Amino acid sequence: MKKLVLISAYFGEYPDYFNLWLKSAAQNSGIDFFLYGDCDISKYEPLPQNVYFFKISFQDLKNKIQSRFDFPVILPKPYKLCDYKPAYGYLFEDDIKNYEYWGHIDIDTILGDLEKFLPHKDYEKLYQFGHLTIYKNTYKNNRRFMENRGQDYRKVFSTSFITVFDELPGMTKKFKLLNIPQYAS
């Protein structure tokens, strides 16, 4: 089983600094990166060996998300995906099944040697901000966002407003209320 995969969903053109992000990802060869989006990746090829691009339209991703829930989800623009990040373990569970941990990452997060900063204790969740959060990849933990304590994912996924579900008022608070081990820097 591999240790960690980090997921990013991005739509539109990658920013000018994306090549720097790719270089920082390449330097973290023990971590895989899954990129979902509709961007033209050809000018960045060949991608580093640990970076995988999954071409998907925003509409197809919305359809995939909707298919996993029994209520209408609201996802008017790609930026709203920040509230769906805690559900990536559930939404992409087939893609990440061979990893011990999964996380979400923003492509404006230029990495140093990330593995040096990963705690060696057994936490269910690492870090507290949306640009980089890591979760233990278990069936229960990947559905933790659905727990009744803290923000209600149904309300979060049913509004066009950004609720910061991926950060302090969302998942960090939920894990704290559920008394689940997390490392929040």
What are these regions (language model features)?
Residues 83-127:
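GT-A fold catalytic core of metal-dependent nucleotide-sugar glycosyltransferases
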Residues 131-137:
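Short glycine- and hydrophobic/aromatic-rich loop-to-beta-strand nucleating segment
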Residues 143-185:
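Catalytic core and acceptor-binding pocket of nucleotide-sugar-dependent glycosyltransferases
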Residues 11-14, 39-42, 58-61, 108-111, ...:
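Short, solvent-exposed loop/turn segments at secondary-structure junctions
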Residues 22-32:
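Short, acidic, metal-binding catalytic loop of nucleotide-sugar glycosyltransferases
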Residues 8-10, 35-37, 105:
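Short beta-strand/turn micro-motifs composed of small residues
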Residues 38, 42-97:
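Active-site-proximal specificity loops/subdomain of glycosyltransferases
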Residues 1-20:
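N-proximal low-complexity "stem/linker" segments adjacent to membrane-targeting elements
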